[in-house]
């Protein structure tokens, strides 16, 4: 199970995927994806995988096997791994999709105001911190009292940066309510979807998802603890 799976349980806005611990994904499993193209992602706990060669787009199964062998076991060095890098021990494979637009959406605990903050932007697929520095006017922040649910008016404000049809607006309403529910029920401190894409059929899809959890609340969530990949944990932190 991955971060995407947690959100998928409440919202169906994901393409078909598989995770493999082997150098070459099994043919039968890949064929179930029923796609003419695939995205391979190195599963390491660090950002910047794409620039380090940890994300590849391929057109067919033969290319998929070739690139999987190239990435598996490779040490990726990114701005978040430090100079020693991280060895790739798992691969995540998903279907490609025809992207029309890329958005950014996150939901987090804003400790300064003791509220839940939704952050959205039409500038998806890039580092949101860079967008905040260069184009702060392109970011929308909506804060919600913890004692309340997300109202229709809140959602209208959250999706204001997005160009959505009535069909995709309904999907956005479902997604926003879903990630709010996951954040509260699982004691998460952050849920980030980047990018949230609109495809050519005007469907919203979550292409990448990140969830941070409150370590002090993990005792209430053995299902979350079971997701831990100790190969990706810092040895000193784990011992501590």
Regions inferred by a protein language model and the residue ranges of each:
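ATP-dependent carboxylate/acyl-activation modules
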Residues: 1-17, 30-192, 197-240
